[in-house]
Every structure is written in C-alpha cells, then in structure tokens.
C-alpha cells in the first residue's frame, strides 16, 4: 500500500517502453549537513546560491536527457511542498509519490517501480538520488545512454566511479568482464567496512 500524489498532467503515460523513466529519491533525515539541513529541511533542498539546490540540479540534469519520461519523485509528506515548488521553479512536471513511512532506498524504489508498472508494460527506470553533486552533465548523459542500452538488453545497471583511494564511507564494486564496451559485469559488491 502506498500513497500517490500527482502534481502534473494525468494524461501522460508510460507508453514508450524504450523511453527512460527517471525516479528521483528524496528521502533522508537531513542530519549530515546539520545545522544547515535538518529533518524538516534536508540537504537536497538547502540553497546553494544562485537558485540552486541539489534537488533542482538533479531535476535539471534529468531535463537535459533526451527521450526522457516525466520523473517520479519519491519523498515523504513533510517534503512534498519543497518538491512541488522546486519543480515549478525549474519549469518541470513530475509525479510525486509519497512514502507512507521512511524505509530507506529499496522500498522507495519499489514504490516507484509499482507506480511505473501500473502505467506501462515494462518501463526502464533511471534511479537517481536527489542529493548528489555532479559537475559534468555531458559525461553523465553519455553514461545514462550507455546504461539505457544495457537495460534494454535485460541487464540491471548500476553506476560506479574509479576511486582515488580507499574510503571507509563507501562500498566498492568488483568489476568483471566487459559487456561490449558499454559496461562490465559485476563480480560482487563489497560493502563499506
């Protein structure tokens, strides 16, 4: 059971199976950047100056992708007005899905997957956190295009970056064989120590 809040034109559907359907995850308790962010005002909505927030940057990155569907945004009741206002300020539409209770990443993705599946046969989802800072949008778009090609072939795709050294705050992906130049098989995920 989930709550669904739709802030946009309901005539839109997920008819095109080849189209990517972005899911922006807006969970989190806002404790990492305290006192700037807090439970009622998490870091993805903190003003970075010049009409920028991490959430707006994510929305604008989504808008820069070709052949993209209307994004699903998963958030809780407390943050839905921040999401709605930010979408309006960016000139974007979005489907806002309200989590009945915060349960971390996997249930939030499942919520969006069920909502997307209700509107289309087998949609390809692009799962994005709302609080990442990415500098190179062109490189991001190229990576998404390669990932979409792999997903259309039936692969589940995750993004990774080459680390510049060991970090205890991050897990690692053990890379396997190449998949035609667009990616690699995953041998295993190594959880953070």
Regions found by a protein language model. Name each.
Residues 2-24, 32-35, 39, 47-129, ...:
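Conserved N-terminal catalytic core of the sugar/cofactor nucleotidyltransferase
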Residues 137-193:
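Conserved core of the sugar-phosphate nucleotidyltransferase
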Residues 43-44, 171:
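Extracytoplasmic/periplasmic beta-strand context in beta-sandwich domains
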